């Protein structure tokens, strides 16, 4: 997936790829989670037929490498923002038939971005979006742009956390890793 920007200053999505996706497989081993994060929090979220586990920031072993990669992708497309602090991170495993309803990670008053790393391939059937992700971009002028993705392992979506998004039902198990960061505007 080539790095490129979709959207405008109101809402945006960057499509990219993260070569070192194996680093995120480490977080699937529950032994690395502090005990308070072993609880499935899916019932508190918009995940259906799947499990969602929060990850304690102290267990996040590859931030030193991933955060600069995100900033590099943001700089590459010319967005004037600087990633600051880690906000939250979690993993989701969708079971057969699992999906996620449309939701946002933030309200408009919080400057936050989300990064989703796909750890499994989407359904190979080119006629369907099973296992794909959808998003709706609002351009600030009342227009909506509907986007659909069929990500492969290692594909990365970085988006403003106010972007409405979700996932289509899966035919097989699917895993994703999600990280939210705060950001601030860069003034040139």
Where are these regions (language model features)?
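Non-heme Fe(II)/2-oxoglutarate
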Residues: 1-82, 99
